[in-house]
Amino acid sequence: MERVIYAVGLGPGDYEMITLKAKKVLEESDIIFLSGGKVFNGYDEVKKLLDNINCGSKLKFYEYPENKNYRHAHIKHFAVETVKYLEKGMKVSYVTMGDMTIYSSFPDIYKELAKHNVVLKAVTGISSFFAPASLTGNSIVDWKDKEAIIQHTEDYNEIENILESFSAV
């Protein structure tokens, strides 16, 4: 039996912007995981979104520590627990706001799941930083512009160089 985890992007926080494919996968799931930190984890927001599509009762929170020293042990534990659900024949999904490939804990988690021969089926969501442009009718970049997406930084020299080099940041 193939072990599959569905990584589902929920979009920018509006249940009407959850893709039809994401909704179908979540409705068919037996358990839906969400990870996050202790302080802000998005649980209430995600629960509300899933309640709107009648899937909130399937949601299970998994702590993803901010502290890198503890993170790996938590990820290993999560992978082992996930495999137990999969071995019972359950359909397991993992949700993120926006898209699971951008500013998400899922890539780290999937690396560990892959060690257990778990196959990824990604259901991408509407990336959160594209939603405002769509809502306002503006483009993020024009034809010859250059766009940069950067990880968090507090290095003002780096920010200054990026702002000088790119039209949209």
For the regions a protein language model found, what residue spans apply to each?
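A contiguous loop/helix-start segment that scaffolds small-molecule binding in enzyme catalytic cores
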Residues: 5-7, 87, 161-169
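Class I S-adenosyl-L-methionine
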Residues: 1-15, 20-23, 27-119
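Class I SAM-dependent methyltransferase SAM-binding "motif I" and its flanking Rossmann-like core
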Residues: 98-165
